[in-house]
Amino acid sequence: MKLKLFFHIVLLCFSLPIWAMKTVDVTASPKMDDQARMNLAQEFANKQQWIDVFNIMYPMALEGNITAQSNLGMLYNLGRGTVRDYEKAYWWFSEAAEKGSVKGLNNLGVMYLRGDYVKQNTEQAIKLFERTAQAKDTDAMMMLSNIYRLQNQPEKIIGMAEESR
């Protein structure tokens, strides 16, 4: 059961999108609009050029772009383009979440569920996943259904399914 939960958490981490940008000149990225920089970062991510993705996401995150903040948190969380640093991942996920990022909240939930940087706290993870599930986020719904299944609480899964209609 715990192995299945771990598998689903890993699957969630890899399914979270790392958004990106369009041209090839990273040095020009600050002069591009946000969508162009996101497109360029996506091209680099598709090629697994994580340092280039990081170099695009970091300034955007500092500028307050919540998608970039959540993506930067994931780069720190996975150690892509930078050294793995759960503290920085938590900080960037929190920044994004405070500004309304569903992905930021979900990623914080995963950190609480796994105990990465924070003390493992399933109840806190559930609270975060419930907040984003209310926004019809399917990743959060999947995480909650797995937690409820492992806790042998099928009635909560049924209730969640009925609410999502």
Curated annotation (Swiss-Prot):
It is found in: Membrane. Keywords: Membrane, Transmembrane, Transmembrane helix. It comes from the Bacteria. The chain crosses the membrane at residues 7-24. GO terms for cellular component: membrane. It is a single-pass membrane protein. Its main location: membrane. PANTHER family: ERAD-ASSOCIATED E3 UBIQUITIN-PROTEIN LIGASE COMPONENT HRD3, SEL-1-LIKE PROTEIN. This is Uncharacterized protein HI_1625. The lineage of its organism: Bacteria, Pseudomonadati, Pseudomonadota, Gammaproteobacteria, Pasteurellales.
